[in-house]
């Protein structure tokens, strides 16, 4: 039993099996047939075969294309998340002027002070919206 386990789990067999399993199916099928020597016919030991690397450049090209697609998707997701801030700016402006109307209805004597606060709130909200829009354009076109 021990000799059988020793034969099945030789380091060269493990190394060769792990590299074959990690390669694509087309790379395994397209391999060139290796010639066996007289030594390998006579003994039961596993002879390590050289691995072909004919498909390695095409695999790295596919990986770079996938990497570019992931980068492009990340750009669009980031720009979309930054654009949400523009919608938040619109909601903020609506809240500011809604509060102005409610405040004026409650106390008409503070009309001038409420209006100046409303303009300040509008300016801050609009500035944040423009900042978010600028970040979205930077993500799309500068990165």
Curated annotation (Swiss-Prot):
Query: What function does the entry list?
Result: Mitochondrial membrane ATP synthase (F(1)F(0) ATP synthase or Complex V) produces ATP from ADP in the presence of a proton gradient across the membrane which is generated by electron transport complexes of the respiratory chain. F-type ATPases consist of two structural domains, F(1) - containing the extramembraneous catalytic core and F(0) - containing the membrane proton channel, linked together by a central stalk and a peripheral stalk. During catalysis, ATP synthesis in the catalytic domain of F(1) is coupled via a rotary mechanism of the central stalk subunits to proton translocation.
Q: Which Pfam families match?
A: ATP-synt_C
Protein name in the entry: ATP synthase F(0) complex subunit C2, mitochondrial
Q: How does it sit in the membrane?
A: Multi-pass membrane protein
Which Gene Ontology cellular component terms are annotated? mitochondrial membrane; mitochondrion; proton-transporting ATP synthase complex; proton-transporting two-sector ATPase complex, proton-transporting domain
Keywords assigned by UniProt, alphabetized: CF(0), Hydrogen ion transport, Ion transport, Lipid-binding, Membrane, Methylation, Mitochondrion, Transit peptide, Transmembrane, Transmembrane helix, Transport
Q: What disease does the record describe for this protein? A: This protein is the major protein stored in the storage bodies of animals or humans affected with ceroid lipofuscinosis (Batten disease).
Q: Does the record bear Plastid in its keywords?
A: no
Note in the entry = There are three genes which encode the ATP synthase proteolipid and they specify precursors with different import sequences but identical mature proteins.
Could you give the subunit structure recorded for this chain? Answer: F-type ATPases have 2 components, CF(1) - the catalytic core - and CF(0) - the membrane proton channel. CF(1) has five subunits: alpha(3), beta(3), gamma(1), delta(1), epsilon(1). CF(0) has three main subunits: a, b and c. Interacts with DNAJC30; interaction is direct.
Source organism: Bos taurus (Bovine)
What InterPro entries does the database record attribute to this sequence? ATP_synth_F0_csu (IPR000454), ATP_synth_F0_csu_DDCD_BS (IPR020537), ATP_synth_F0_csu_sf (IPR038662), ATPase_proteolipid_c-like_dom (IPR002379), F/V-ATP_Csub_sf (IPR035921)
| A molecular function (GO) term | lipid binding
Q: Does the keyword Ribonucleoprotein apply?
A: no
């Amino acid at each position: 039993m021990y000799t059988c386990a020793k034969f099945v789990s030789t380091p060269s067999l493990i190394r060769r099996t792990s590299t074959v399993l990690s390669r694509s199916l087309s790379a395994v099928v397209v391999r060139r047939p290796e010639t066996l020597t007289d030594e390998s016919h006579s003994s039961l030991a596993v002879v390590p075969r050289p691995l072909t690397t004919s498909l390695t450049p095409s695999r790295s090209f596919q990986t770079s294309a996938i990497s570019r697609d992931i980068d492009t998707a990340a750009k669009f997701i980031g720009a979309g998340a930054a654009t949400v801030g523009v919608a938040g700016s619109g909601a903020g402006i609506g809240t500011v002027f809604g509060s102005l109307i409610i405040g004026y209805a409650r106390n008409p004597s503070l009309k001038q002070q409420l209006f100046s606060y409303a303009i300040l709130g509008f300016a801050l909200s609009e500035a944040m919206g423009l900042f978010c829009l600028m970040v979205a354009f930077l993500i799309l076109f500068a990165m």
